[in-house]
A protein has these predicted regions:
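Bacterial N-terminal signal peptides that target proteins for export
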Residues: 1-9
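Surface-exposed, charged secondary-structure patches
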Residues: 68-113
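Short, well-ordered alpha-helical segments enriched in acidic and aromatic residues
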Residues: 41-57
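Short, low-complexity N-terminal intrinsically disordered segments enriched in polar/charged residues
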Residues: 19-37
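Low-complexity, intrinsically disordered terminal/linker segments enriched in charged
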Residues: 129-153
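A short, surface-exposed beta-strand/turn
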Residues: 113-124, 130
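Bacterial N-terminal signal peptides
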Residues: 9-18
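A solvent-exposed, acidic/Ser-Thr-rich amphipathic alpha-helical stretch
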Residues: 62-67
Length: 153
């Protein structure tokens, strides 16, 4: 009897782990964390992983290949990869999320924007874009007409 009682906690643990795997969903943070882990070694594999979360992207293989090639060409000009940091996370309801990161390189940063959608119970990457215009956006944001003290409410 005591042997049986000792095995109950282990059985309960395995049962609960099974439930979290079955009912748990991948979060957008888990997707981007894995994306950047892959990205540090192979940017093309990271993009493939991101879009693998969306079954509909199989129909856009040419566009994904083009995206990977253009990003590689840009990366080749930017120097060594130095890491990343999240800039913002915006939501529209409970099923749409846009997450923006700065990807740091020796020469200049690149902005990555992930657009996630959850049609049912699982987040998927619906769109991914990148650009190097973060400096222009910051410059625009600091223009006098955008400053709080110059806004007439």
């Amino acid at each position: 009897m005591t042997r049986f009682l000792k095995t109950i906690p282990f059985l309960l643990l395995f049962f609960l782990l099974g439930l979290t795997k079955t009912f748990g969903q991948t979060t957008t943070q888990e997707i981007t964390d894995k994306f950047f882990t892959l990205y540090s070694k192979d940017p093309a594999k990271a993009i493939d992983y991101g879009f693998s979360t969306n079954k509909w992207m199989d129909r856009k293989l040419d566009a994904v290949t083009d995206l990977k090639n253009k990003l590689k060409n840009l990366i080749d000009l930017c120097g060594d990869y130095c890491g990343y940091e999240m800039l913002s996370e915006k939501t529209a309801g409970q099923n749409i999320k846009m997450v923006t990161f700065i990807v740091k390189y020796d020469r200049e940063p690149i902005r990555f924007t992930f657009f996630f959608y959850k049609p049912k119970d699982k987040w998927q990457l619906n769109n991914f874009s990148y650009d190097e215009d973060i400096d222009k956006d910051l410059e625009e944001a600091t223009k006098a007409y955008r400053l709080k003290e110059n806004i007439n409410w």
